[in-house]
Amino acid sequence: WVDRPATDDKVLVNLEAGKRYKIKVEYFDGGGDCFARLYWKAPDLDSRDRINLFGEAGKAAKECDITVAVLGIDKSIEREGQDRYTLELPADQQEFIREIYKINPKTVVVLVAGSSIAINWIDENIPAIIDAWYPGEQGGTAVAEALFGKYNPGGRLPLTFYNSMDELPPFDDYAVKKGRTYQYFTGKPLYEFGYGLSYTKFNYRKLNIASKQDTINIQFSISNTGKYDGDEVAQVYVQYPETGTYMPIKQLKGFKRVHIK
């Protein structure tokens, strides 16, 4: 059904090589928008054989100084009218990056996706991660310039990266106040809304808050304490006093991107 995650029904069937098998599919739509989809998973292979299925990836990882692994999803998994039933990467990609990491721990992961992905193992083990989103036909150039230092990244996440689906309410209940989005989520996310890194560091100081009638003016100073020029995105969030109503935990009220040498 379109108003909830897909139901994944599995059955174990023994198949013999060289034989043809007939598959009977019974489908019933009792109302609303419903669809069925069949998936095929290749027989389990040894992990090393699985690496070989990806061409020369395993060999290249052994020979290079640093491995850049591009992972993610595309419109075959998530698009308008089709939602994912899990926040994780496809199982073969999870196995792939684990094996690549064993071969060469100096690995960079580039994520390609249009939404958040639960990359818990990658976060714990891979030393560098860059989220490329869906970058377009010049995306490779943009990623390369960021990785090789020609461009110092300064982007910030426009959404929350959760650890798992267990942290979210049922898919068919999109009541935001039940823990959805950074405004109402009370747990500790994998990456929070507004999170982002660069090749330099910044320091905030001299915070001054002045109130005049219904207007609040906030001023502060930002200095670049690192070795490289870079962009910082200053963000101002507000929290509401107890009012008896279920107000957001916090809300973004202002932000500005500034380049600091």
Label the predicted regions.
Residues 1-66, 81-83, 88-92, 247:
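Acidic/polar, compositionally biased interaction segments
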Residues 18, 213, 260-261:
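Solvent-exposed, conformationally flexible loop/turn segments
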Residues 34-36, 78-80, 119-121, 228-233, ...:
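Extended hydrophobic-aromatic, low-complexity segments
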Residues 48-124:
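Hydrophobic helix-and-loop "lid/oligomerization" segment in the mid-to-C-terminal part
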Residues 112-231, 237-241:
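Secreted, periplasmic, or luminal enzymes acting at the cell surface/secretory milieu
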Residues 244-261:
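Intrinsically disordered, low-complexity Pro/Gly/Ser/Thr-rich segments with frequent PxxP/GP/PP motifs
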